[in-house]
C-alpha cells in the first residue's frame, strides 16, 4: 500500500478522496486548516512551509502520490486569500514534496482545478502571468477593475494559472523525468459544503442554480473521488499533463469549438523546433 498526501482533507471532495484511499488500505496524510493530521493555513507562506515540511517528516521522504484539493470559492472580499490558497497553496507544496514523490519513481499527482478555467469570461491574462511569475500583489492589482466581481475573476485566474503550471511542469525532466505523473481535474458544481453554503445564500443561489449544466443537477463528491483514484492508479501511467473536465457538460456547452485546436501556421517554426529538441525522459530513469 502507498502513502498519499491530501490537502483539503477535512471536508468536501478532499475528504471523499481520503475515505476512498483509506478504504483501499493506503496511508493518508491529511492537510487542512482544522480537523486534519497536519493542521496548516495554506493562505500564508509560513503555513505552506510548515505543511510542506510536516508532510515530508510524516512520510519519511517517500510519497506515492498527492492530491491538492484545498481551495476557496469566490468569497466576497477574499481575493488575496483565494489567490494564496488556490495557486500558491498548490505550487509551493508540490515543489516542497517533489523529492519525496520522485523517490518512488511512479508517483501520481492530481491537482483540483475547476471548470471556471473555461467558463468565466474576461479573466485578465496579466493576472495569470503574474501568478505564474510568483507575484500575488500584481495579480491582485489586476482584479481591482472588476469591483464586486473581483472574487469570481480571482478564483478563475487562480485555477487557470495552476493548470498552466501543471501543464508546463508535467512534461519536464524534474517531473516526468522523475517518474511523476502530474495532472489536473476540473470539476463543475459538486455538492460539497462549499456549494451548500452558496445555495443557502440568496445572493448566490440564483446564479448557481441557473448556471448551464446540460445533464442537470450537481455532481457527487464520491464520484469525483473515484476519478481521482483512477488518476492515482497504475492505469493512469500514460496520463501526463492532462486537464480532465468532470462538469456535466458545461465546458462543452460554452466552448464546443475552442479546443482541441490545431497548431496555427504562425507557430509552425516553434513547433518544429520543439520536435527536433525533444528527448524522451524514459532513458534517464532507472
Label for each model-derived stretch:
Residues 31-50, 55, 71-72:
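Rossmann-fold cofactor-recognition segment
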Residues 1-29:
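Canonical Rossmann dinucleotide-binding motif of NAD(H)/NADP(H)-dependent dehydrogenases/reductases
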Residues 92, 154-155, 160, 184, ...:
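C-terminal helical subdomain
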Residues 72-76, 102-177, 189-190:
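Catalytic loop of short-chain dehydrogenase/reductase
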Residues 51, 93-101, 165-166, 227, ...:
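Hydrophobic positions on the long internal alpha-helix
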Amino acid at each position: 500500500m502507498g502513502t498519499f498526501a491530501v490537502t483539503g482533507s477535512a471536508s468536501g471532495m478532499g475528504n471523499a478522496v481520503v475515505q476512498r484511499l483509506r478504504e483501499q488500505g493506503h496511508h493518508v496524510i491529511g492537510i487542512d486548516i482544522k480537523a486534519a493530521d497536519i493542521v496548516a493555513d495554506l493562505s500564508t507562506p509560513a503555513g505552506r512551509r510548515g505543511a510542506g515540511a510536516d508532510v515530508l517528516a510524516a512520510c519519511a521522504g517517500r510519497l506515492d502520490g498527492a492530491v491538492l484539493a484545498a481551495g476557496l470559492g469566490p468569497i466576497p472580499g477574499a481575493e488575496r486569500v483565494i489567490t494564496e490558497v488556490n495557486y500558491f497553496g498548490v505550487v509551493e507544496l508540490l515543489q516542497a514534496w517533489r523529492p519525496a514523490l520522485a523517490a518512488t519513481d511512479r508517483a501520481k499527482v492530481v491537482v483540483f482545478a475547476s471548470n471556471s478555467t473555461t467558463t468565466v469570461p474576461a479573466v485578465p491574462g496579466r493576472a495569470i502571468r503574474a501568478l505564474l511569475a510568483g507575484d500575488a500583489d500584481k495579480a491582485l492589482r489586476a482584479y481591482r477593475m472588476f469591483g464586486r466581481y473581483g472574487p469570481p475573476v480571482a478564483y478563475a485566474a487562480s485555477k487557470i494559472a495552476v493548470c498552466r503550471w501543471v501543464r508546463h511542469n508535467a512534461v519536464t525532466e524534474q517531473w516526468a523525468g522523475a517518474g511523476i505523473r502530474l495532472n489536473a481535474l476540473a470539476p463543475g458544481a459538486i455538492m460539497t459544503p462549499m456549494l451548500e453554503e452558496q445555495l443557502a445564500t440568496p445572493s448566490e443561489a440564483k446564479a448557481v442554480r441557473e448556471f448551464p449544466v446540460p445533464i442537470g443537477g450537481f455532481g457527487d463528491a464520491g464520484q469525483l473521488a473515484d476519478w481521482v483514484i483512477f488518476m492515482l492508479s497504475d492505469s493512469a501511467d500514460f496520463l501526463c499533463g492532462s486537464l480532465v473536465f468532470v462538469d456535466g457538460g458545461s465546458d462543452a456547452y460554452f466552448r464546443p469549438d475552442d479546443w482541441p485546436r490545431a497548431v496555427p501556421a504562425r507557430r509552425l517554426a516553434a513547433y518544429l523546433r520543439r520536435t527536433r529538441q525533444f528527448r524522451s525522459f524514459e532513458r534517464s530513469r532507472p
